Amino acid sequence: MYSFNTLRLYLWETIVFFSLAASKEAEAARSAPKPMSPSDFLDKLMGRTSGYDARIRPNFKGPPVNVSCNIFINSFGSIAETTMDYRVNIFLRQQWNDPRLAYNEYPDDSLDLDPSMLDSIWKPDLFFANEKGAHFHEITTDNKLLRISRNGNVLYSIRITLTLACPMDLKNFPMDVQTCIMQLESFGYTMNDLIFEWQEQGAVQVADGLTLPQFILKEEKDLRYCTKHYNTGKFTCIEARFHLERQMGYYLIQMYIPSLLIVILSWISFWINMDAAPARVGLGITTVLTMTTQSSGSRASLPKVSYVKAIDIWMAVCLLFVFSALLEYAAVNFVSRQHKELLRFRRKRRHHKSPMLNLFQEDEAGEGRFNFSAYGMGPACLQAKDGISVKGANNSNTTNPPPAPSKSPEEMRKLFIQRAKKIDKISRIGFPMAFLIFNMFYWIIYKIVRREDVHNQ
C-alpha cells in the first residue's frame, strides 16, 4: 500500500514538472520577436523610413565613388564604312559600394532585387561618349539586374544595343585594319565625385563563337583611360579599343578577280588579225566600258574621301591597261596603213616635178630663148635649195650621185605590215609583264609593308 502511494506521488510530480516546462516554452515562443519580412527589410533599408536619399551619392562630400565596369559582348556587327559606325549588343555591368545599403538584419549574403527598385537607389550617370544611337531591351521584361551585398556592394547590369561612331582610315581598303573604340564617361559628376575604372579581371568579355561577316575581332583589346577636360570640369572616362582585321575574300571575288579577267580579256586583241578592225575595236570598247562600270561599283559602298584607297589604285591601273590595249590597236592600224600615205605622197611629188622638167626642156630646145646651160645652170641648179646654184662652168662637169632605187608599193606595204605585227608581238609580252610587275609591287606594299606600319602604330 505504501509503495503504491509513493508511485502515485512520483507520477504526479512528473506530470506537473513537464506541464510547467511546456508552458514556459510556449510563453517564451510568444514573447520572441518575429523574423522581419523581405518587404519590411527593404523599407527599412531604402524606404522612406530609412532616411536613404537616391539623389545623394555615397560618401557625400567625401572621397569619390569608384565604379568598376565590365562589358560582355553578345554580338558585334553591322560595321558600315559609309556612315563610319558599328553596332554592338552588350551587357554593361557596374559595381560600386554604397555604405548606406550595408545590412546585418537579413540572413542572406546578397539580395537580387526587381529592376523597379533601381529608382530607389543612387546610380552612376554613365553614358557612351561616341554613341550615335541606343536602346534598352524589354522582352519579356526589363533586361536589368540589381544585386545588393551584405557589405553594401551594388551590382547593376543592363543589356543594351549601341550604334557607336568609328572613324576609319580606308587608305589600305580592302586590306585594312580598323580600330573601333567604346568610350564610357560620366555626364554630370566630376572626378571629385565619381571615378570609372575597368574591372581587374575580364574587363571585356566576348561571347563564345562570335564571328563577324567581313572582319576578324582580334583577341587583344586595349583598355585605356581617357579623362575629359571641359569648361565644366574634369570628368572620368574609360575606353575599350577593338582591333578589326578585314577579310578580303568578298572583295577578291567581287572586284579583284573580275577586273583581272577583264584586263586579260583585253589582251586577246593582240592575237586577233589587224585587219579585223570591228572585232578588235569592239573588244577594246567593251572591256573599257566594263572596267569603268566595275570601278564605279567598287566605290558605291564607300564614303567619299579625299585620299586614294588601295582599291582605287587597282581599278585605275586596270582601267589604264584596258584603255592602253585599245590605243595599241589604234597604233597598229595607223602603222599598217602608212604605206598608202607614203605612196600618195610620192604621187603628189612626181606630179609637182613633171611640169618643171618640161619647162626646162622647152627652154633649151626653143630658138631665141635664154639658155641656162651656157652659164652652167640647168634644172638641177634651179631646183637647188634656197636658190643656191651648183658651181662650175659646165653642168656636164658636175657629177650627181645615182638615185637610190625606190621600193615597189608591194614591198612598202609588207614593210609597214611587218612593223605593225611587231608592235602586236611586243604587246603580247610587254602588257602581261608590266601587269605582273605592278601586281608584285601592289601586293607587297599593301599586304606586307603597310600592314607592318599599322601593327607598329
From Swiss-Prot:
The record's section on Pfam families has:
Neur_chan_LBD (PF02931), Neur_chan_memb (PF02932)
Mutagenesis / variant outcome for changing V308M: In HKPX1; high leak currents in the absence of glycine due to spontaneous channel opening
Q: What is the effect of changing E220A?
A: Abolishes potentiation of channel activity by Zn(2+)
Q: Which GO terms describe its molecular function?
A: extracellularly glycine-gated chloride channel activity; glycine binding; identical protein binding; ligand-gated monoatomic ion channel activity involved in regulation of presynaptic membrane potential; taurine binding; transmembrane signaling receptor activity; transmitter-gated monoatomic ion channel activity involved in regulation of postsynaptic membrane potential; zinc ion binding
> Mutating P258S: effect?
In HKPX1; impairs expression at the cell membrane; requires much higher glycine levels for channel activation
Q: What is the effect of changing H137F?
A: Abolishes sensitivity of channel activity to potentiation or inhibition by Zn(2+)
Query: Which ranges does the record list as Extracellular topological domains?
Result: 29-250, 299-309, 447-457
Main location per the UniProt record? membrane
Which cysteine-cysteine pairs are annotated as disulfide bonds in the entry?
A: C166-C180, C226-C237
Function noted in UniProt: Subunit of heteromeric glycine-gated chloride channels. Plays an important role in the down-regulation of neuronal excitability. Contributes to the generation of inhibitory postsynaptic currents. Channel activity is potentiated by ethanol. Potentiation of channel activity by intoxicating levels of ethanol contribute to the sedative effects of ethanol.
Note, other: The alpha subunit binds strychnine.
Q: What is this protein called?
A: Glycine receptor subunit alpha-1
Species of origin reads Homo sapiens
- The gene designation is GLRA1
